Amino acid sequence: MEEKKQQNVTIKGTKDGITLHLDDCCSFSELLKELDEKLSTHYYDGDGRSLIEVHVKVGNRYLTEVQQEEIRTLIRNKKNLVVDSIESDVITKEEAIAWKEETEIVPISKIVRSGQVLHVKGNLLLIGDVNPGGTVIAGGNIFVVGSLRGIAHAGYYGDSDAVIAASVMNPMQLRISDVAMRAPEEKEDGAEAAECAYINENNHIVVDRLQLLTHLRPNLTKLERGIV
């Protein structure tokens, strides 16, 4: 009895086009050969005019940029096919380090004085004050266990879901992503309480009670919820 040949390429039709599931154990050259053979059939000629989107899933195979381009070129050379995405379940060590830096909470204990700038890639937990003229910047959220009287910029790389929270919120300016808010009027003595700032549905920065934060941003991590 002839042994059934291992299928390295599986093609599935979807409402958005077709999805290619590529085996992650065979050699890359074998993969390209079988992909070329299977896409050379007449199944995807369509009406000769409409482009068909192709989503490529490669599982636990890491593809270099050159290999990705080889796959794109092979598919592009077939009639009416265009690559929409190539998805892999693995990342490089460098990508993993960058992701960790962007998502981790960085605890720092200090006073940010006038003229000083404190910048972290991920989420900032500052135990101390931000004095007038001082600036704190984070790629993610900013939590100040102390007085925020300077400038705070959260979501620096474009994260509009980022938040700013402080034990005492009297900033010179707040920025989240590309949205800015000038300081509200100075609070009366004794009226200060922990507050948070976020972008609302109208794309405006709103300052509200800190207790609302876990309801407004339920996707905060367990550690971040513990902070607020």
UniProtKB/Swiss-Prot annotation:
The keyword Cell cycle applies. This is Probable septum site-determining protein MinC. It comes from the Bacteria. Interacts with MinD and FtsZ. Belongs to the MinC family. The keyword Lipid metabolism does not apply. GO terms for biological process: cell morphogenesis; division septum assembly; regulation of cell septum assembly. It holds the Pfam family MinC_N_1. SUPFAM superfamilies: Cell-division inhibitor MinC, C-terminal domain. Cell division inhibitor that blocks the formation of polar Z ring septums. Rapidly oscillates between the poles of the cell to destabilize FtsZ filaments that have formed before they mature into polar Z rings. Prevents FtsZ polymerization. Keywords: Cell cycle, Cell division, Septation.
